[in-house]
Every structure is written in C-alpha cells, then in structure tokens.
Amino acid sequence: MIQDTIADMLTRIRNANAMRIYTVCMPMTSVAREIAVILETEGWIDSWKEASVNSLILRLKYRGAKQQPILTGLRRVSRSGCRVYVSAKEVPKVLGGMGTAIISTSKGIMTDREARNHRLGGEVICLIW
C-alpha cells in the first residue's frame, strides 16, 4: 500500500518523463485528480482521464524533434513527516513565475498564482518547473 500518493504520482511522472514515455498510469485519489487538472490547465501535461474507478492516466507533453520534456523538474515540498505551510504573503514563486507551485488552501487545491490572487495561504504540495 502506498503511504504518500502525491509523492508516488510525482515520482511516476518524473520517471516517465526521463524515459520519454507518453502515458502514465497511477492510482487515483481526489487530490491526484485535482493535481492532474492543474497540470493540464497550466500546460504541463497534454491530457488526463479516469481509466477506471481506481486509476488515472496522464498523457505527457514533449517538444521538438528530439522530444525534449516540457517538465524539467518536480519536487514534493510538504511531506507526511514535515508539513510546509505558508501565509498568503509567503506563497513561493517558482523560477520567478516560470514554474508552478501547487498549494492546498481552505478553498481547495490551486496554483500559486490563484492563491496570491485570492490572498490565501496553505500547504505547499509541490513545485513544478
């Protein structure tokens, strides 16, 4: 059984990205589905779909003839052993705004830009660049 489903999701994406694999299958949770929606709307992945009740399939994006990955880095920030919370003023900017931070707020899971616009802080789930 997987203890940290978000870390497992990010690791599967990171490994598939390194091997230039287009589709990634993973166990589906409500948080994983919301992260997949954010990744798609921000342009980090091509698409996602629910394959069955318990699985989620992501289609990764690559660019150019050499199939360079769009995602160059994923990092889990808040872990089960060490939670990281930030106030609305301390919401991180990833690479000066070129990347995305995913924040779990009282209004749901959102990007760093949305959290700043709504003036919300919360738990920093991961950083994507």
UniProtKB/Swiss-Prot annotation:
GO cellular component, one term: ribosome
Superkingdom of the source species: Eukaryota
Subcellular locations according to the entry: Plastid, Chloroplast
A Pfam entry, by short name: Ribosomal_S8
Keyword line: Chloroplast, Plastid, Ribonucleoprotein, Ribosomal protein, RNA-binding, rRNA-binding
GO MF term list: rRNA binding; structural constituent of ribosome
One GO term of the biological process aspect: translation
InterPro entries named among the record's database cross-references: Ribosomal_uS8 (IPR000630), Ribosomal_uS8_CS (IPR047863), Ribosomal_uS8_sf (IPR035987)
Assembly notes: Part of the 30S ribosomal subunit.
Sequence similarity: Belongs to the universal ribosomal protein uS8 family.
Function: One of the primary rRNA binding proteins, it binds directly to 16S rRNA central domain where it helps coordinate assembly of the platform of the 30S subunit.
Record-given protein name: Small ribosomal subunit protein uS8c
Organism: Nephroselmis olivacea (Green alga)
